[in-house]
Amino acid sequence: DKEFSMPDNFYDDYEGRPAAAAQTMSIAKDMDIIYDTKMYREGMKSRLKKAYGRKIKRLTPEDRVAYDAVYDSITDVFFRENPQGKELVEWKYQRFMRDYAKVVKSLDDNVGRVLDYLEKAGLLDNTLVVYTSDQGFYMGEHGWFDKRFMYEESMRTPLVMCLPKGFQKRGDIPELVQNIDYAPTFLELAGVSVPSDIQGVSLLPLLKGESPADWRTS
């Protein structure tokens, strides 16, 4: 497994930021050893053990076999080495990042499958494919995981588009866009009138390579 570099502020002391210090998404304090890192042996206790059990029960028998094939060996090593203190905190970070990276890899593979299907079906030139999310996620910055604190890392969201034929724009778009812009974009692209009470702005000018002078800056 890959060894991930830790963010420079992983051991943030939150000096002068009492709200940040009081958050409940610390890798050290709040990352549940059973629920979040999936390390479980019979008889173990944790705050989220029951929630973990409910999730495991949702797996099909085939999925459970595949799940155990991955995590049984990792769990064996974890209990044999028995990390404590700072070593445990950094182990949790690595486990979290490795799981996250594998999820992202699976997403990437399956986005590729969708694009391959659209191309084979002759639909790719007439389809807008959008990959996005509802919020960002902490990847160890400030010693955090999860997303529930309004710092830069969780404010930003991914937005990647595969454009239909006729749109020449490629690469990064530097203008500030928001998720409220998606609905008017889709409506305009489909040739539907955008209701006056929609708050967002269509992204089509940006996707066409234009730079409107009155585009938002904040």
Specify the residue positions occupied by each region the protein language model found.
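Active-site-proximal cap/lid insertion segments
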Residues: D1-L176, L189-D197
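Extracytoplasmic/periplasmic beta-strand context in beta-sandwich domains
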Residues: T157-P158, V201, T217-S218
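Short, solvent-exposed polar/charged micro-motifs at secondary-structure junctions
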Residues: A20, P205-G209
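Catalytic-site neighborhoods of secreted/periplasmic enzymes
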Residues: D1, K147, E210, W215-S218
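Glycine/proline-rich active-site loop of Rossmann-fold NAD(P)-dependent oxidoreductases
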Residues: V194, I198, P212-W215
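Generic recognition of well-ordered alpha-helical segments
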Residues: R156, Q178-L189, S202, L206
